[in-house]
Amino acid sequence: MNDTQHTPPFIAVVPARLASTRLPNKPLADIGGKPMVVRVAERAVESGAQQVLIATDAQAVFDVARAHGIDAMMTRADHPSGTDRLAEVAAHYGWRDDMIVVNVQGDEPLIDPALVRGVASHLAATDGCAIATAAHPIHDPADVFNPNVVKVVPDARGVALYFSRAPIPWARDAYQPHWPNIAQMPAPPAPAAVYRHIGLYAYRAKFLRTYPSLSISPIEQAEALEQLRAMWHGERIAVLVTNDAPLPGVDTPDDLARVQAFFGSSA
């Protein structure tokens, strides 16, 4: 992990909602004797954030956070995304324009605190960017062609050129449009490294306050990728490249069982 030597002050916000179709009440799922959302917040604390808080529209999540000594804020229930929820929090607290706010997903109890700290540092070190995120190289050809694996192409400065569910960049001489078997595809050629986007974001508070006023963009709708809204409106996104893939989050009961085993708990 390439981390800036002097990490700037930053705030970590954990958006959490109970309305999960695949895993109801996910933030409250027990992981080693603590609710998942608390485990996530503890990772955020380990990152060195000067403030960690849980943003939720559920009273049960708010109460659990406070019971474990974690700051929490009740937000509106009609937010279409976690970024919109963060925008409400930023407006409520009135953080200064250049304060860095990291969105730590509430279903990532195994998130590496160094990665949280890293995206905050990367944003502070990259002039002209309102957002920072992370990515790692893809080595499995199946992931290159998997639309559920979001790819990102950064420029020479490490600023995102585009995010897509499609295989980008397309290595013209290495790939054929109709492979009979994905398993037979070659790994991405070195000159055209393919990066998998990691869904961790750091924002400047000024951007968060303007985000709700940005109109939904055609490319955001086509790709179903929220970050493309910011790019459509001219914002630049810095990309921190790390060699290691993060441990997966919790989306399904099987994911939960795996994480519970990691923490030595029982389902």
From Swiss-Prot:
Keyword hit for Nucleotidyltransferase: yes
Record InterPro entries: Cytidylyl_trans, KdsB, Nucleotide-diphossugar_trans
Subcellular localization(s) per the UniProt record: Cytoplasm
Pathway(s) per entry: Nucleotide-sugar biosynthesis; CMP-3-deoxy-D-manno-octulosonate biosynthesis; CMP-3-deoxy-D-manno-octulosonate from 3-deoxy-D-manno-octulosonate and CTP: step 1/1; Bacterial outer membrane biogenesis; lipopolysaccharide biosynthesis
CDD domains noted in UniProt: CMP-KDO-Synthetase
Gene Ontology biological process: CMP-keto-3-deoxy-D-manno-octulosonic acid biosynthetic process; lipopolysaccharide biosynthetic process
Keywords for the protein's UniProt record, in alphabetical order: Cytoplasm, Lipopolysaccharide biosynthesis, Nucleotidyltransferase, Transferase
Record's catalysed reaction(s): 3-deoxy-alpha-D-manno-oct-2-ulosonate + CTP = CMP-3-deoxy-beta-D-manno-octulosonate + diphosphate
GO cellular component terms attached to this protein's record: cytosol
EC nos: 2.7.7.38
Name of the top EC class for this enzyme: transferase
GO molecular function annotations of the record: 3-deoxy-manno-octulosonate cytidylyltransferase activity
Pfam families hit by this protein: CTP_transf_3 (PF02348)
Keyword Acetylation recorded: no
Family matches, as NCBIfam families: kdsB, PRK05450.1-5, PRK13368.1
Sequence similarity: Belongs to the KdsB family.
Function: Activates KDO (a required 8-carbon sugar) for incorporation into bacterial lipopolysaccharide in Gram-negative bacteria.
Name recorded for this polypeptide: 3-deoxy-manno-octulosonate cytidylyltransferase
Organism in which the protein naturally occurs: Paraburkholderia phymatum (strain DSM 17167 / CIP 108236 / LMG 21445 / STM815) (Burkholderia phymatum)
Recorded name of the encoding gene: kdsB
